[in-house]
């Protein structure tokens, strides 16, 4: 797999306080990586480093030449007094044709939202629009900062299924940031546990049993994860992430989220 971004012994200090300590991280094409950690662990700072928005105190970051990064922020702040449709919001991302805007929305199952008021969207609808905006760049790397914030549980499952589908469709790398792993883990290739330094990293199965992860999140999180993996009813999804009628099935004894589909 081609390496898109490599962080080598990254350190970031704020007023003599070390926020990131000797971070080593590699993001490769086609992989979904989930960065987890409690509030204040340095996750947002690490995202800024990857996006090139945060200077380093020491260390080195290597980016593939010409890499395109699509970013979905944790929060979207809009001026409530200014009317803004989804279509107009997407046009703010650059010079794209009407067809390109419609295609981006179609890919995320949001084509029907094109004329909707941005201020009146639900949490899940907002995330789909933000994802569509990121896809307009045809990114090599998609960075999502707490993408499920403000989205209900079923909406989270649908959102992560959609991200997984888009990864398979475009072959891009995905970096997801979260403080809660009980849903995202089923769709992740690699997990990185952060508490200013990398506490542990590896496959979802190994991290769920790792002492550092259990110390950070507790056994209850692992139990919730196991329930999601083995007992939920899931649907096959089309490219937009919407369920295909008549193809629902129940998972009883296997985890289906860890295989890469080429």
From Swiss-Prot:
Gene3D superfamilies: P-loop containing nucleotide triphosphate hydrolases
Lineage start: Bacteria, Pseudomonadati, Pseudomonadota, Gammaproteobacteria, Vibrionales
Annotated positions binding ATP: 37-44
Record-linked Pfam families: ABC_tran (PF00005)
PANTHER family, A to Z: METAL TRANSPORT SYSTEM ATP-BINDING PROTEIN TM_0124-RELATED (PTHR42734), ZINC IMPORT ATP-BINDING PROTEIN ZNUC (PTHR42734:SF9)
Major subcellular site: membrane
Description of how the protein assembles with itself and partners: The complex is composed of two ATP-binding proteins (ZnuC), two transmembrane proteins (ZnuB) and a solute-binding protein (ZnuA).
One GO molecular-function entry: ATP binding
Protein's UniProt name: Zinc import ATP-binding protein ZnuC
InterPro entries attached to this UniProt entry: AAA+_ATPase (IPR003593), ABC_transporter-like_ATP-bd (IPR003439), Metal_Ion_Import_ABC (IPR050153), P-loop_NTPase (IPR027417)
Domain ABC transporter, residue spans: 5-220
Function of the molecule: Part of the ABC transporter complex ZnuABC involved in zinc import. Responsible for energy coupling to the transport system.
EC number: 7.2.2.20
SMART domains with a match to the protein in the record: AAA
GO biological process: response to zinc ion
Gene Ontology cellular-component annotations: ATP-binding cassette (ABC) transporter complex
Catalytic activity: Zn(2+)(out) + ATP(in) + H2O(in) = Zn(2+)(in) + ADP(in) + phosphate(in) + H(+)(in)
Main enzyme class: translocase
Family that this chain belongs to: Belongs to the ABC transporter superfamily. Zinc importer (TC 3.A.1.15.5) family.
Bilayer topology term: Peripheral membrane protein
Keywords (A to Z) from UniProt: ATP-binding, Cell inner membrane, Cell membrane, Ion transport, Membrane, Nucleotide-binding, Translocase, Transport, Zinc, Zinc transport
UniProt subcellular location: Cell inner membrane
Organism encoding this protein: Vibrio cholerae serotype O1 (strain ATCC 39315 / El Tor Inaba N16961)
